[in-house]
């Protein structure tokens, strides 16, 4: 009896919340419709022109990004290319990888998807064997590592999978959320709610540049499949 009463009470509370939300949405729509009804022809024309201008600017921005190599996940051949690519784009994600590290291939699959979804960000990959100077300069020790570059400066790193739930089975949405936390792409979800369920266990402490140390020239792998 008590269990049924609790369920009924919860259902009523949920129903009331849904009704209140629906009412607020309807009121907002009514308000917007009323504003449009009160506009004269000149005001409607100005509104139309404003929206067309916004669409035009958005299309121009998209074409500019595409011309700079956004919209695809590309490999760059050398350290010199890394610096040149960073100069051209405001937001860059670069995957420092090694062919023999299995987890790098996992990241590749997710980065291909995100590169097509987030045109505002450039997605690159660079073989650590071809970038010894850069890896030392950025203090990259664990493979894979994502370097997150904004306005030509390295702002943050995603080292291994510790920020992604410590699992090889993390979703593209989890990586998207993590990159959104560093403002390296436009994240539309709630940054306070990580997509992976094990948030409490692993926490949300991210690896920062100042926490890195150089311990020799050999790279450590975050994967057991070396």
Curated annotation (Swiss-Prot):
Keywords: Cytoplasm, Cytoskeleton, Nucleus, Phosphoprotein
Keyword ATP-binding (UniProt): no
Entries under InterPro entries matching the protein: Thioredoxin-like_sf, Thioredoxin_domain
Compartments, as annotated in UniProt: Cytoplasm; Nucleus; Cytoplasm, Cytoskeleton, Microtubule organizing center, Centrosome; Midbody
Thioredoxin domain segment(s): 52-180
Superkingdom per UniProt: Eukaryota
Modified residues (Phosphoserine): 188, 221, 223
Gene Ontology BP terms: microtubule cytoskeleton organization
Record keyword Zinc present: no
Any Pfam family the entry gives: Thioredoxin
GO CC terms: centrosome; cytoplasm; midbody; nucleus
Function summary: Significantly diminishes the chaperonin TCP1 complex ATPase activity, thus negatively impacts protein folding, including that of actin or tubulin.
Database matches in PANTHER family: THIOREDOXIN DOMAIN-CONTAINING PROTEIN 9
Subunit structure: Forms ternary complexes with the chaperonin TCP1 complex, spanning the cylindrical chaperonin cavity and contacting at least 2 subunits.
The name this protein goes by in its record: Thioredoxin domain-containing protein 9
